[in-house]
From Swiss-Prot:
Site residues (Involved in the stabilization of negative charge on the oxyanion by the formation of the oxyanion hole), renumbered to this chain: T115, G116
Gene: argJ
Domain of life: Bacteria
Listed name of the protein: Arginine biosynthesis bifunctional protein ArgJ
Compartmental location: Cytoplasm
Originating organism: Pseudomonas syringae pv. tomato (strain ATCC BAA-871 / DC3000)
């Protein structure tokens, strides 16, 4: 079940960015599993990619090509084309070449993306056979269909859109994402595509998506695994009648930054809300750190703990598990007598011990909620970080045990 995630909001079309969807039947016949995106000529494209050393063949190619001239993004679901060695690279190149031949662009102007089962050969012929139908379907209004087309174990499509006005010109930022499992920071089993009609230099665009992803996609964790295939792409088509943004300053840049960050945050949190088998959406706030890294270390120790995640699923306020996770986070010279821990607004531990005012009934009431905040005050400094995660349910085990069957 998705926690607090409803139907897609209105996804505003982005001038100069079209999407087309078709079926290659990669995992099952008739399923829409190929998405082609076309960028207007002169668009800037930037991206961030998985840090997994076993990164997939399409990731390797996309990273090589992203700073060049990009006209098309080609996505398939049902097959990750990861762990496939040189044949996987050959297969990824073949799909790009097939699309290039149909559209009259150079193959280097096509960026490939794949998601699905790892270690199986990419069914190149099936993808090639679906390309013309996807091209015939290209439309600026196809964001919702594309959000469905990139899904794997997701239960709902994910998207967000923002608009703002500058000097009388409306700028649009729209994005979609997919992901429900193998979610771990530094990009997870996640694909994200965000487009705007602003005109932005490639260097500024790259910094923008890096910073936006760092505060959103890179603060998610569902199961602690980092995928081989992740990426988040930001495309600026330059169709809006405004000057090019060439520096990370000024009113136009700040307005665009806010819109991009808002879209990143919304589609990133949607991934957690739709986490495989999730019944709880959990925010882990760590305040009072001496530096940001120790806040993250504590936050991830809590968010990754199977004992805490199963307690969340059971609505069991087992606060000792939270203290244990904080203590093993590896923060040097941690003074536990300064640590306070809260469940929602309830103080469960004060100065490293059970709070004198805390009752089990208070904790149980918070843990029964669908959305829970665990707040940890370290008392060491002024740094803070926030991470989003889920509980760990029977359904998560079932989904992943049956993934290839």
């Amino acid at each position: 079940m998705a926690v607090g995630l409803g139907p897609l909001p209105a996804l505003h079309p982005v001038p100069g960015f079209e999407l087309g969807i078709s079926s290659a039947g990669i995992k099952r016949p008739g399923r829409k599993d190929v998405v082609v995106m076309r960028c207007a000529e002169g668009s800037s494209v930037a991206g961030v990619f998985t840090l997994n050393a076993f990164c997939a063949a399409p990731v390797i190619l996309a990273k090589q090509r992203v700073q060049g001239t990009v006209r098309y993004l080609l996505t398939n679901t049902g097959n990750a084309n990861a762990g496939t060695g040189e044949p996987g690279l050959v297969a990824a190149r073949r799909t790009c070449e097939a699309l290039a031949q149909l559209t009259g662009v150079d193959a280097s102007a096509v960026l490939p993306y794949s998601t699905g089962v790892i270690g199986e050969p990419l069914p190149v012929e099936k993808i090639e056979g679906a390309l013309q139908a996807a091209l015939d379907d290209l439309s600026v209004d196809n964001w919702a269909a594309a959000a469905t087309g990139i899904m794997t174990t997701d239960t709902l499509p994910k998207g967000a859109s923002r608009q703002f006005t500058h000097d009388g010109v409306t700028i649009t930022v729209t994005g979609i994402s997919k992901g429900a499992g193998m979610i771990r920071p530094n990009m997870a089993t996640m694909l994200g595509y965000i487009a705007t009609d602003a005109k932005v230099s490639q260097s500024v665009l790259q910094d923008l998506i890096r910073d936006g992803a760092n505060k959103s996609f890179n603060r998610l964790t569902i199961d602690g695994d980092t995928s081989t295939n992740d990426c988040c792409m930001l495309i600026a088509t330059g169709q809006a009648d405004l000057p090019e943004i060439t520096e990370a300053k000024g009113l136009l840049f700040e307005a665009l930054k806010k819109a991009v960050f808002d879209v990143c945050m919304e589609v990133a949190q949607a991934i957690v809300r739709d986490g495989e088998g999730a019944t709880k959406f959990v925010t882990v706030e760590v305040n009072g750190g001496g530096n940001h890294q120790e806040c993250l270390d504590v936050g991830y120790a809590v968010a990754h703990s199977p004992l805490i995640k199963t307690a969340l699923f059971a609505s069991d306020p087992n606060w000792g598990r939270i203290l244990a996770a904080v203590g093993r986070a590896g923060v040097p010279d941690l003074d536990v007598s300064k640590i306070d821990v809260f469940l929602g607004g309830v103080c469960i531990a004060s100065q490293g011990c059970r709070a004198t005012t805390y009752t089990e009934e208070q904790g149980s009431a918070v843990m029964a909620e669908a959305e829970i905040t665990i707040r940890i005050e370290l008392g060491r400094g002024d740094c803070s970080e926030t991470i989003w995660t889920t509980d760990l349910s029977h359904e998560y085990v079932k989904i992943n045990a049956e993934y290839r069957t």
